[in-house]
Amino acid sequence: MPALNRLLLLSNSRNAGQGYLEHARDAFRDFLGTEVSRVLFIPYAGIRISHDDYAASARAAFEAAGYGLDAVHDAEDAGRAVDEAEAIAVGGGNTFHLLKTMAEQGLLPRIRARVEAGMPYIGWSAGANVACPTICTTNDMPISEPPSFEALGLIPFQINPHYTDAHPPGHQGETRSDRIAEFCTVNPAVPVAGLPEGTWVRVEGDRLSYVGHAPARVFRGTEAPVDVEPGDGLQFLMDGGR
């Protein structure tokens, strides 16, 4: 992957008992530092919330961390806003609708180029999904049809956010692990990292660290899943998955 990529990819936006993005406030400060003063927010994954209301929630969270926030839907030229942004934050919601809207506005190649040149990228849930090669490991229903499942490709592996393998007694449907295993059976060369809520990955160039309170679960081909504790144990995902 390009050596300048800087990514902070979160599983979720809210932990139980905490405010919106409160659990990531210190991570935002550590990641963005003092070189960034404002971030550009992309609210297109929001479905049952207006872009304005979504941006207001994100703005309050980033201001609490010490950063201003501008929303891409308020810009006269969304592409130019991306080109001039100091950092980008992509919110969660429906991944299919997010990717469709980003594609329609021509933002995918512009975001990719900026991130590969060193612009910080923050994404949570759907915003983490679109940083992957494809959106094929999202948990969302396909309520909108993007032109392709191909996404930004900022990392060489897939993420499944909100990962849990809970299986209520008596429930006969597939578990999350079952669904991810289906993806890996069809795409054996592409590893998937299941990120429990309250966790995230941080990418600095070709280095990756995993932060949180619980192990990530990694799926590869038909191999048995492997749990990886927080730290640098997921680095192999940046090194070809082995």
Q: Which residues does each predicted region cover?
A:
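Catalytic nucleophile loop
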Residues: 89-92, 114-134
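C-terminal and late-domain segments of enzyme folds
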Residues: 2-34, 49-56, 60, 137, ...
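Structural motif
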Residues: 8-9, 87-91, 122, 159
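Short glycine-rich anion-binding loops that position phosphate/pyrophosphate groups of nucleotides
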Residues: 13, 47, 93-96, 127, ...
